[in-house]
Regions:
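Short basic/hydrophobic patches in alpha-helices and adjacent helix-turn junctions
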Residues: 67-71, 84-87
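Short alpha-helix boundary/capping elements
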Residues: 50-57, 86-90
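Acidic, glycine/proline-rich low-complexity segments that act as flexible tails and inter-domain linkers
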Residues: 1-43, 55, 62-66, 70, ...
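C-terminal structural segments of small proteins and small subunits
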Residues: 79-103
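Winged helix-turn-helix DNA-binding recognition segment
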Residues: 73-77
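Short, structured motif recognition centered on aromatic/hydrophobic residues
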Residues: 43-51, 81-82
Length: 120
């Protein structure tokens, strides 16, 4: 029983991107780089762009967006990242990421589209 509880707890923590669990169990550091080459905000914005470009799932996009906000990025800067990666990542990747990034910014874009009388 103990083993089942352990794997379930690890899976739960991985699903919510528990940074300590990821570091302890997988040996991955999710900390923002401290090399001095990029400030934490810029590094977090680059990570958001990378998450969008590779088609990351919702939990990763929301996590990355939340980290960028915590590092001092604004909603406008994060939106700018989406626009900047569009030509390279493709419109489909960006459009697919928008609802999850918007949710992390506290904006329900899907409801807003439904409420728009002019449509999308």
């Amino acid at each position: 029983m103990g083993q089942a509880v352990r794997f379930q707890e690890v899976l739960r923590k991985l699903a919510i991107i528990d940074e300590r669990c990821v570091a302890d169990q997988a040996g991955l550091s999710l900390a923002l780089p401290t090399s001095g080459l990029l400030d934490p905000k810029t590094a977090a914005l680059v990570q958001v762009g990378a998450l969008v470009a590779i088609g990351s799932p919702a939990v990763c996009l929301e996590w990355g967006t939340t980290r960028a906000l915590a590092a001092g990025a604004t909603a406008d800067e994060i939106t700018g990242v989406l626009l900047a990666v569009g030509p390279e990542a493709g419109l489909g990747r960006v459009a697919g990421a928008v609802p999850d990034v918007a949710a992390a910014l506290g904006y329900d874009v899907e409801t807003a589209l439904l409420e728009d009388p002019d449509g999308p």
